[in-house]
């Protein structure tokens, strides 16, 4: 799960620099964490980044990982992302 998250964040960061400052990245992370967003909705959001079946499968697997988490874990991921956005390393962006 961690590897998939890193790969998705790396791919999206190529599209726009975040720190937060990138509404697209923030929206994707929010939709990734949100258990109310289905895998179909999630794929529609990321359609412009999907080139092949391998990417589609990776996106499905990433979303499924988050759908299988408890509310507490999802809440902790939100806190973690906010800590990253607020970190001094992201001030550079």
Swiss-Prot record:
Keyword Secreted: yes
Organism: Homo sapiens
Gene that specifies this protein: SCGB2A2
Glycosylation sites: 53, 68
Keywords carried by this UniProt record: Glycoprotein, Secreted, Signal
Subcellular location: Secreted
First and last residue of the signal peptide: 1-18
This protein's name: Mammaglobin-A
Predominant location category: secreted
InterPro entries in alphabetical order: Secretoglobin (IPR016126), Secretoglobin_sf (IPR035960)
Any one GO biological process: androgen receptor signaling pathway
Transmembrane segments: none
Cell membrane listed as a keyword: no
Alphabetical list of Pfam families matching this protein: Uteroglobin (PF01099)
GO annotation, cellular component aspect: extracellular space
Tissue: Mammary gland specific. Over-expressed in breast cancer.
Highest rank taxon of the organism: Eukaryota
PANTHER family xref list: MAMMAGLOBIN-A, MAMMAGLOBIN-RELATED
Record family assignment: Belongs to the secretoglobin family. Lipophilin subfamily.
């Amino acid at each position: 799960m961690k590897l998939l998250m890193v790969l998705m964040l790396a791919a999206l960061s190529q599209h726009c620099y975040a720190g937060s400052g990138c509404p697209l990245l923030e929206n994707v992370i929010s939709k990734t964490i949100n258990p109310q967003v289905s895998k179909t909705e999630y794929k529609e959001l990321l359609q412009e980044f999907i080139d092949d079946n391998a990417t589609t499968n990776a996106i499905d697997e990433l979303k499924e990982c988050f759908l299988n988490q408890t509310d507490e874990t999802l809440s902790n991921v939100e806190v973690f992302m906010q800590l990253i956005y607020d970190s001094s390393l992201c001030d550079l962006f």
